[in-house]
Amino acid sequence: MRFEFTEEDRAFREEARRWLLANVPSARAPMGGPAARAFALDWVRKRHAAGWSGISWPAAYGGLGLSYERQIIWHEESVAAGAPSPLDPTFVCFNHAGPTLIACGSEAQKSFHLPKILAGEALWCQGFSEPDSGSDLASLRTSGRVEGDHLVVNGQKIWTTHADIADYQELLIRTDPGSQRHKGLSWVICDMKLPGITVRPIENMAGVTHFAQVFYDDVRIPLSNVVGALHDGWNVAMTTLGFERATAATALQVELSARIEALSAMARMRSDAVDGGLLHRIAVARAEAAALRALTYKTLFKEPATPFDGSIVRLFFAELAQRIYRIAMDLLGPQNAEASPDNEWIPAYLEAFSETIAGGTAEIQRNIIGERILGLPRGGGR
Ligand SMILES: Cc1cc2nc3c(=O)[nH]c(=O)nc-3n(C[C@H](O)[C@H](O)[C@H](O)COP(=O)(O)OP(=O)(O)OC[C@H]3O[C@@H](n4cnc5c(N)ncnc54)[C@H](O)[C@@H]3O)c2cc1C
């Protein structure tokens, strides 16, 4: 595969760079809650007003309808200009809810929701995991009973990132009573303001409250909110996870590459205090970041693609992120880390522990790679 940018792509890059450098917010993004929502949506609105929202989304729903190469250019220039991290509260909207609606939604669902996302009028969260159903998602029990033209939802989700500030949720529930495993599930658009929904935020070890438990008590959701066919939610969910693990990595790996460059610069400034072992780790991580970039682009443009390809990218990204933030801690030293509580490396280091859990744990990604991509036998007598 050859991946090259055209003359037109380069002109687009120049234009994007000029706009970003003049418009990227100078304030740091708040970590969670309503302030994080307001900050993230303001940034989307600013992009939307200037015609930069939804680079590769279909023009029919308010996007620019440009190639995915242009989307990549946008991510690269955003990171270079110091734009807010793509892992902000709009991450689900832009990286998997919107793309899932584009791939599987009805005309009515697309026309209503996609322009709202692009205009910064709505935030989404993802309600897949349950207290006893994380890695084994197919065992989920939150139910949706069909009653006339509504589903009546009862149960509980957990680890729902930004549930406290989201307007809509990708909700995966069991709609066929008595069904087992992957069968009988539905992927439903849930309005987070509906009566019967209770959100209880959970604080993580970085001291940030950005995920939550969500309880559903006779929540009535119109059947027209089912995405794809009723009881066929597993296929839609696999589409969502495919986006979460592959295309979503585009923006994140660009950001990670910028982090390792910043670390290299920091090491150059402290050259007298940095030993050869640390320099070696930085050099290896820099090479791995370049390899991750090549791997991400290869996966994005692979044909035919499968929903499992993203697991390789997701796993490599997650473990590399942890290595890079560990290097940052070793380079800074404990005294510098403690002395500067607003230092952005410390929260990033703490948050990176979750990279090998969120979106499917490292063990689950390895299982998928082994079983679905390499065709190895299923292990452990499952
Ligand atoms: C920061 C963060 C944000 C998240 N945001 C969301 C969100 O917005 N929406 C959402 O729905 N979920 C979210 N999650 C939840 C995430 O998807 C789950 O935590 C993840 O899928 C693991 O599930 P679990 O926590 O139930 O762990 P478990 O499934 O109980 O796993 C426990 C351990 O057992 C291992 N294990 C389990 N099964 C196997 C197996 N078959 N083979 C080998 N090892 C196995 C796991 O790898 C893990 O180490 C988030 C998680 C994190 C950390």
Q: Where is each model-derived feature located?
A:
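Glycine-rich phosphate/cofactor-binding loops in nucleotide/flavin-utilizing enzymes
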Residues: 2, 69, 73-77, 96, ...
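Glycine-rich beta->alpha junctions and the first turn(s) of the following alpha-helix
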Residues: 3-5, 197-291, 355
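C-terminal helix-coil-helix/basic helical segment that borders enzyme active sites and/or dimer interfaces
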Residues: 28-34, 268-279, 289-343
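Internal helix-loop-helix
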Residues: 48-111, 115-120, 162-168, 289, ...
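Glycine-rich phosphate/pyrophosphate-binding beta-alpha loops
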Residues: 94, 134, 158-163, 205-206, ...
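A short, Trp-centered hydrophobic/proline-enriched beta-strand micro-motif
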Residues: 120-128, 172
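A structural signal for short hydrophobic beta-strand segments in well-ordered beta-sheet cores
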Residues: 142-145
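A short core secondary-structure module
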Residues: 149-150, 154-200
